[in-house]
Regions:
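Short catalytic-loop micro-motif centered on adjacent basic/acidic residues
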Residues: 90, 120-123, 230-235
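Alpha-helix-loop-beta-strand connector modules within alpha/beta enzyme cores
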Residues: 101-117, 165-176, 335
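Histidine/acidic residue-rich metal-binding segments in metalloenzymes
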Residues: 131-147, 152-306
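His/Asp/Glu-enriched, well-ordered alpha-helical/loop segment
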Residues: 198-219, 223-228, 278, 299-300, ...
């Protein structure tokens, strides 16, 4: 099967180029002007549209196994391809937790049957599974995930000797959720003394505070420098944390890297008034000054990748009474790319920089094989975008199993027209193909 995409504006490797792109089977076979391949092929006229590499989201929670009333790998990967996300790395805080090699392979087996996007997973670290982490083949999965602050699923790793042993012995990316547990507990106790469990939601960033984030991130970075570990700090949310990261060496040479999430680039603490607990995340959405600093650090390359931390809960769960009863997290994977393209429309970030942070850099950071770029011989994971097709996020166009979005009512100028996964048309003009084409991601390690 061949598909010829004609006259697209390719956004790739810091260039915009009008060209044709030929897909043969799973791969990009040719890129150039006025291609006329031999034999039968389908033609897509992409005049006036932009062709991007598929987005690689390095942090999602798809809730399977065990929490499938919220989401499944099938439902959320459908939403992903509708949003231009062709590869995801899923987190270990499912039920049961993904903390053994056996549980890890069980997840791969689920995804092999049901994932519409390419997939890999993180093996979770705990206070007592160091030997399991040592047995992990570096090529087997995305990396190891450590919760250095407690969050959904209660996978807190708080034994300092264990953390240092993991940093010293794990020979692949260690992705860390960094919030200082003692600081959070102290802050929570303070506000519970004032409000009981009816703590106003706008105090969430005071409980899961900037201080808690900085303490934990700085401690993890110091330990990574001491041990030589390959540390990737997830979801930076504060101005202070951005000062901990470098931009004076290429990403491929960095041992310590950072991710920022769409919601920390989009919302501020002012939005708690209108969105309430729907925008309760860990780490918390913080001040406008924090958001501005995150944008600056993203644009000057101290922050390396943009992701979602897609973390669905049911609307009933999010609308519960009582601060500690309300789970943190929200669905975003269907809207991460269009949200960033909206920022491009407003002149905040360039298309080239979006592709760098959402496509190229995750591939570099995780040593992903043959994905993340528009290159001959690479897998044809592609997104065709119309930059001028105004539409509104509404319940009826959501594909998340949970059926809600923190972005409902938001207008976007950019629209995903088509998404290709491994050369197959996975999404086209509002419809997801019924066949899941996702494959297990392989790594050059």
């Amino acid at each position: 099967m061949k598909t010829l995409i004609k006259n697209a504006t390719l956004v790739n490797e810091n260039e915009l180029q009008v060209a044709d792109l030929l897909i043969e089977d799973e791969r990009i076979s040719r890129i150039g002007a006025n291609l006329h391949p031999k034999g039968d092929y389908q033609v897509i006229d992409a005049t006036g549209k932009y062709l991007l590499p598929g987005v690689i989201d390095d942090q999602v929670h798809f809730r399977e196994p065990g929490l499938t009333h919220k989401a499944t790998i099938a439902t959320e990967s459908r939403a992903a391809v509708a949003g231009g996300v062709t590869t995801f790395f899923e987190q270990p805080n499912t039920v049961p937790q993904t903390v053994t090699l056996e549980r890890l392979e069980e997840k791969f087996a689920i995804a092999q049957k049901s994932s519409f996007a390419n997939y890999s997973f993180f093996l979770g670290g705990t206070n007592d599974n160091l030997e399991e982490l040592k047995r992990l083949d570096p090529k087997a999965c995305a990396g190891v995930k450590l919760f250095l602050g407690s969050s959904t699923g209660n996978m807190l790793v708080d034994d300092e000797k264990t953390i240092e042993a993991i940093f010293s012995n794990v020979d692949l990316v260690i992705a860390a959720h960094c919030e200082d547990e003692a600081t959070i507990r102290k802050n929570l106790a303070h506000y519970q003394a004032l409000y009981g469990n009816d703590i106003p939601i706008d105090l969430h960033p005071h409980i899961r505070s900037a201080e808690a984030c900085y303490l934990s991130s700085s401690r993890a970075i110091a330990l990574a420098k001491k041990t030589g570990a390959r540390l990737h700090v997830f979801h930076l949310s504060t101005a202070a944390e951005t000062e901990l990261f470098r931009n004076d060496i290429p990403l491929k040479d960095k041992k310590i890297t950072a991710e920022v999430c769409v919601h920390h680039l989009w919302f501020t603490a002012d939005d708690y008034d209108t969105r309430g607990a729907l925008i309760k995340w860990n780490p918390a959405v913080k001040t406008a000054e924090d958001r501005a600093a995150l944008w600056q650090a993203l644009l000057d390359d101290r922050l390396d990748v943009i992701a979602t931390d897609h973390a669905p809960h049911t609307l009933e769960e999010k609308q519960q009474k009582g601060y500690t009863n309300i789970p943190s997290g929200a669905p975003l994977v269907q809207h991460s790319l269009v949200a960033m393209l909206e920022k491009a429309h407003k002149g905040v970030i360039s298309l080239k920089k979006i592709v760098e942070k959402m496509c190229h850099n995750p591939a570099i950071l995780f040593d992903i094989e043959d994905r993340g770029y528009l290159r001959e011989g690479y897998y044809a994971d592609l997104v065709l975008v119309d930059m001028n097709a105004l539409w509104t996020v509404q319940k009826q166009n959501l594909l998340y199993k949970c059926g809600w979005s923190p972005l409902e009512g938001q207008q976007f100028h950019a629209k995903i027209v088509s998404t290709f996964v491994n050369g197959q048309l996975a999404y086209n003009n509002g419809q997801v193909c019924p066949t899941p084409y996702g494959q297990r991601v392989t790594f050059n390690r």
